[in-house]
Design a protein with these regions (language model features):
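Acidic, polar-rich low-complexity tracts and alpha-helical solenoid repeat scaffolds
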Residues: 18-258
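Sec-dependent bacterial lipoprotein signal peptides
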Residues: 1-19
Length: 258
């Protein structure tokens, strides 16, 4: 990620400058054992991160925070610990560090990055949306926050794209549940789920089937005017769709039989 590469570069530059600016400064640092421990811990964290030992790296970054909690190194170290975990897919550990960062350093310039990485950690754990919505909802929450509160950042555009994908995922869950009720002949719960797709997810790829099912079920229940309403909507927007052809056949079945 661009921001993390930037943080790594800046951290290394600042580390070198702080240690080699001049002899007088080096002697001051040597006299301050706590600061030396902090610098050494950060250096070890960077080294271990580059070697791939992310657990030891994160431990060292956490040490920096403990040694110098009020320094500029503390929030950077917190973010580096989070990224270390994220880089090896330890999402829950990364989430813990990021939530801690946002609680302690909510006015930091890299807050937008923390929200983005937090959203990605939840997003990457979306596995079976039919069973668990927890990660989807969390990802949507943080991505929405990015788009609304940090619209001009480098992360906002990707956040918009991922929000569109989440919208599709949520619509697919509604369709799954609607079809579940349909297969079990639970008409009213099925209708309610299909209506939710029409009302809340009308820009997704699932809208055509939802409209057709509303034609089918309303016709089955003898609600022909309702069936016609959804058929007109389907025909107006998706006239070339196979779902419209099926709905047309349902409504003209009576005429074909006479």
């Amino acid at each position: 990620m661009k921001r993390v590469n930037y943080l790594l570069c800046i951290s290394l530059i600042l580390f070198v400058v702080s240690c080699a600016e001049n002899k007088e400064k080096i002697s001051v640092v040597k006299d301050n054992n706590l600061e030396m421990q902090m610098i050494e811990a950060y250096r070890e964290g960077i080294d271990e991160f580059n070697k791939g030992d992310i657990f030891f790296a994160a431990k060292k970054f956490n040490e920096v925070e403990l040694l110098y909690p009020q320094s500029i190194w503390a929030p950077r170290s917190n973010l580096m610990a989070a990224y270390a975990y994220y880089s090896q897919l330890y999402f829950n550990d990364a989430i813990y560090e990021l939530e801690r960062f946002l609680n302690k350093y909510n006015n930091h310039p890299d807050t937008d990055y923390a929200y983005y990485l937090l959203a990605i950690c939840h997003y990457n754990q979306i596995q079976n949306e039919k069973k668990d919505l927890g990660e989807i909802i969390k990802a949507r929450e943080y991505l929405t926050k990015l788009v609304e509160e940090y619209p001009d950042t480098e992360f906002a555009e990707d956040a918009k794209y991922k929000l569109e994908l989440i919208h599709e995922i949520l619509a697919s869950k509604e369709l799954y549940l609607a079809n579940y009720y349909l297969d079990r002949e639970k008409w009213i719960p099925a209708i309610n789920r299909y209506k939710k797709i029409v009302n809340e997810y009308d820009t997704t790829i699932f809208i055509e089937e939802a409209l057709y099912r509303l034609v089918e079920l309303n016709y089955k229940l003898g609600l022909e005017q309702e069936a016609k309403k959804y058929s007109v909507l389907l025909g107006y927007n998706y006239q070339s769709s196979e779902w419209y052809e099926l709905s047309y056949n349902i409504l003209n079945k009576k005429n074909q039989n006479t």
